C-alpha cells in the first residue's frame, strides 16, 4: 500500500514502519538498533548522500542543510565533496547508467513482512521494469566480514541483497509484480570506476528468507520479551560498556564470540512498543 501519511518530510522519523536501514542496524548490533544513541554522519556517508541528492534533484537543498561541505574561508567545496562531483559527472556520462537512473525518484511504498510494517524509498523506480538503488563505495573489491570471518563480495558484506529483497517484496505487494533489482554503483577512486550489477532472483529469495528468519527475534526484543544482544564492537557498545573482570584471552572478542564462551553481554530489555503509538 501507499500510505499518504508517509511522506518524504516525515519518512525518516516515522517509526511505525521498520525501514531497511533500521533493520540493517539490528543485524549489526541489536542493542544499538534499540537505543537512542546517535553518531555523527561520517564524511563517507555524506558524500554518498550528496550523490543521491543530486540524482533526485535535491542537491541545492542538501547543500543548504550541510554547510560543512564547504570551506569556511573560500566557500569552495571541500576535497571529498569535490570528488563527489567527479562521481556524479562520471555516472552522468554513461547512457546505460542514466537509463537506469531515469525512473521516478525517491518513491515511497509500505507493506508488511511477517506482520511487521515496512517502509521503502527507492532511488529510481522504473515502473513495471526495475527497482534501482544507487551506491557509492571505496572500490569494488571484497570486504572483510566479521560474521563470515572472511573477505566476501561487497553486495553481501553491506547487505545490499537484503535491502533490495525488502524493496522487491514491498513493490510486489503494491503492484502484483516481481521486478528485477539492479545496483548502479560508482567508486571513490580517481578516476571513479562505475558498474551496473543485477542481483539474481535466487539471491533475493534467499535474502528475503533471512529477513523473515530474523523478524521474530526483532519483534521479541521490540515487545520487551528478550534483551537485545550487544555486539561489543560498535560505537554504541564502546560508549556504554561497563568494565568487568574477565580473562585477558577474551579481550577484543565480539559479543557473539563472548556468548559462545558463556559470557553474557546483553542490554536491558526494552520497553514494549505498540505500533499504533508511533503512527
Where in the sequence are the language-model features?
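Coil-to-beta-strand transition motifs
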Residues: 115-119, 126-129, 178, 189-192
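Metal-dependent nuclease catalytic cores that hydrolyze phosphodiester bonds in DNA/RNA
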Residues: 1-121, 232-235, 251
Amino acid at each position: 500500500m501507499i500510505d499518504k501519511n508517509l511522506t518524504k518530510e516525515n519518512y525518516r522519523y516515522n517509526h511505525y514502519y521498520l525501514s531497511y536501514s533500521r533493520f540493517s542496524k539490528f543485524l549489526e548490533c541489536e542493542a544499538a538498533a534499540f537505543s537512542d544513541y546517535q553518531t555523527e554522519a561520517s564524511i563517507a556517508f555524506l558524500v554518498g548522500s550528496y550523490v543521491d541528492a543530486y540524482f533526485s534533484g535535491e542537491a541545492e537543498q542538501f547543500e543548504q542543510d550541510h554547510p560543512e561541505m564547504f570551506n569556511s574561508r573560500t566557500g569552495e567545496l571541500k576535497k571529498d565533496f569535490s570528488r563527489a562531483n567527479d562521481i556524479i559527472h562520471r555516472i552522468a556520462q554513461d547512457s546505460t547508467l542514466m537509463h537506469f537512473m531515469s525512473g521516478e525518484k525517491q518513491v515511497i511504498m509500505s507493506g508488511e513482512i511477517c506482520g511487521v510494517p515496512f517502509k521503502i524509498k527507492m532511488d529510481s523506480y522504473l515502473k513495471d521494469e526495475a527497482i534501482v538503488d544507487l551506491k557509492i563505495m571505496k572500490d569494488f573489491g571484497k570486504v572483510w566480514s566479521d560474521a563470515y570471518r572472511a573477505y566476501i563480495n561487497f553486495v553481501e558484506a553491506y547487505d545490499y541483497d537484503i535491502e533490495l529483497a525488502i524493496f522487491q517484496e514491498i513493490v510486489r505487494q503494491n503492484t502484483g509484480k516481481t521486478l528485477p533489482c539492479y545496483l548502479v554503483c560508482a567508486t571513490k577512486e580517481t578516476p571513479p570506476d562505475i558498474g551496473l550489477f543485477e542481483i539474481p532472483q535466487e539471491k533475493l529469495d534467499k535474502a528475503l528468507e533471512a529477513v523473515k528468519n530474523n523478524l521474530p527475534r526483532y519483534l521479541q526484543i521490540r515487545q520487551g520479551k528478550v534483551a537485545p544482544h550487544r555486539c561489543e564492537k560498535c560505537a554504541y557498545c564502546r560508549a556504554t560498556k561497563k568494565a568487568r573482570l574477565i580473562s585477558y584471552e577474551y579481550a577484543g572478542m565480539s559479543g557473539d564470540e563472548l556468548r559462545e564462551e558463556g559470557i553474557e553481554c546483553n542490554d536491558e530489555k526494552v520497553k514494549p512498543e505498540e505500533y499504533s503509538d508511533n503512527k
